[in-house]
Amino acid sequence: YQVMDRMVIAIALGCAFIRIGNFFNSEIIGKPTESNYGIVFTQPIEKKINSQLPFVKHVNFTASGKYYELGKPILQTSIVFENNLYMEDRIRNSVEKRLKYILPNKISTYSNVINPYQGSLDYSFHRTKDKFVLRFKSVGINRHPAQLYEALNYFIIGVLLFLIWNKHRSRLRPGRLLGLFFLIAFSTRFFIEGIKENQVSFENSLYLNMGQLLSIPLFLLGFYFFYNGKSIKKIQQLWTEFFFDKKS
């Protein structure tokens, strides 16, 4: 069982890197901060623009330093198209028909950049020798970087468990580090889940989301592991007795 105690150190650090990956992919996003602190996750809307408008090379969002409302920074938005004259008419027609509908006009669960201007959205085209660019203003939604909160949490847990194991390895009871991992990871996760957007729609009707509900029994399991040195062995025994007939 000492192997499991060591494994949780690597698992904690691995979870930290997974959450960093989620951050860069704009996955498992946090709720709006409703303040001027936060992160605007632009990757999802960049993908949508690429799929809705033709000949897009890349999309850039730049903070203007101004705010539409508290927690909603105004972004200078540039869409760079392929620079070929024969494509221009199709690009202009697509922008005229679709641009004001690509961005949502209000905050929803997964909206990160919105267009509160709707029909009054002002945009302009600019051509240089190297590129053909569409420029307009959009409004970002400041959100909690919940992935980074969780990554930092797991990293601290991993380092803490390693230090404890390195200093007290000869005196640690089997299951003690495993229990400590469950206690810290799932107690902190319970609170971090509270600032994440729900992952599936049915969670909207729940008082606690699924991440919080799953954290409760795992926290209790960690409590059991931590205070009972023979806990893992007992769990295995109960598991065996449940699925297999003793007489057989």
Predicted regions and their residues:
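A feature for loop-to-transmembrane-helix boundaries and adjacent hydrophobic helices
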Residues: Y1-S248
